[in-house]
Amino acid sequence: VETFIVCVVGVYVLRMVVMMLYAFSIRLPVFKFNKIERLSSILKYSLLIIIAGSIATIILDIDSFMLGLYIPIEEVAYYGVAIYIATVIVVPSRAMQQILQPLTAQYLNEKNKVALKDLYVRSSQTLFIIGGLIFLLIVLNINSLYETIPPQFSGGLIVVFLISMAKLYDCLMGCNNVVLFNSDYYRVVLIFGVILTILTIGLNMIFIPRYGINGSAQATFIAIAVYNTIKIYFVKRKFDMMPFTIDTGK
């Protein structure tokens, strides 16, 4: 275990060094200690974005915590393994959103609604295709995948399927979060996140005592589906655009 942790830390440090050297090769940083204008607004925006962006991760941690209150602790480990398997689906989405961040900010600043809508739709279609492929690979090979880990962790097939569906819905949203974070409506993401948290806790209290880890997965799936639907509807109302079209299902 200690060797594994050292290797993981080493990989992250190596990645940081490589990225730092590449960035320095393009342009060396210049340190200046000037007075920052509108510092309070910048700090407020940064704090809200950090909190709102952490909601999805916090939700999965809430699930694990609440499971420990209702079921044996070993079943929480089964749930954790299933969650990590399903989370692979959104890895391409996280990478693409970092790329889309400056483009989205540019189009919003220029009020270029045509380009923004095109980016919204294309990002949704691209991520849905990639996420859908990973989803199929996971679902079709889940039994073989569980054979590679200890048998005691092989529970949670339903959890993998439900959380994978929720993550696939995240992919279908395209750059929805990026649009909200870079617009004047970034505050509402935090409000939606609070609603999601309350909904998740309430559903977990109902489903976990009845269905165990499968109940927690059901609660998470319902909460994320409601959360994503609200955000899609909000962007539709404020920007008059949807992430998917008739061609999405083809």
Language model segments and positions:
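Interhelical loop/hinge segments that connect adjacent transmembrane helices in multipass membrane
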Residues: 2-5, 17-60, 103-118, 237-249
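Hydrophobic alpha-helical transmembrane segments
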Residues: 1-25, 45, 195-199, 213-234
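Membrane-interface junctions at transmembrane-helix termini in multi-pass inner-membrane proteins
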Residues: 1-2, 164-195, 235-239
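Interfacial segments at transmembrane-helix termini and the short loops linking adjacent helices
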Residues: 73, 138-168, 174, 214
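Interfacial transmembrane-helix starts/ends
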Residues: 43, 80, 104, 112-141, ...
